[in-house]
Amino acid sequence: MDKRTEMVAGASRIFDLEGFRGVGIDRVIEPSGVSTRTLYKHFGSRDGLVLAVIEARHARFMQQLTLESGTDDPIGSLFDTLHEWVAEHGARGCMLLRARSEYASACEAVVTLVQQQKQEFLREVSRRVDLALGRGDEALALQIWLLFEGATASASVASITVINEAKRAALLLLQLAGDNVA
């Protein structure tokens, strides 16, 4: 693993567990054992590192979705992937939204990147709705996206089983949309 990748991985763990803005730079670089100078050489700033971390996190999640995209249940598998992700990484809500919240007035680049990533995920949900129904349904895609985002947040304050309930609701909405084809 190269230094840049190592710094992103180490900072990702720290940011995920301890937050973004309230953690000192020495703590952020501690897992990779690099100097502050090395951090600035690779990322230009702390915000540059934050951007790299949320880019990597989003890419990993989207890759995880791609790995299971061959399933015959394109909507249910979204929630199965979320369940696996939360079981592996912990239920702390969406790291991207936490970054956006902490940087809302401090770094427009973080806010913009998270918005773009959420739109990319909504497009993926929409693509899966198209696969499941054989036609587009943007309202249904938005509803399923909201269930997914809500389950991600709710799992952090309730039980991971809320993901299963969100899956059931999404599949019911999908069934209703399929039944209402004229």
Predicted regions, residues:
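Amphipathic alpha-helical packing segments from all-alpha helical-bundle domains
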Residues: 62, 67, 73-76, 106-132, ...
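Short amphipathic alpha-helical elements of helix-turn-helix/winged-helix folds
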Residues: 10-14, 85, 124
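Hydrophobic alpha-helical connector segments
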Residues: 52, 63-92, 141-144
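Amphipathic alpha-helical interaction segments
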Residues: 48, 77, 81, 95-98, ...
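Short, basic, alpha-helical segments at the C-terminal edge of helix-turn-helix-like DNA-binding modules
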Residues: 55-61
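Hydrophobic/aromatic-rich alpha-helical bundle segments in the mid-to-C-terminal region
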Residues: 109-116, 131-182
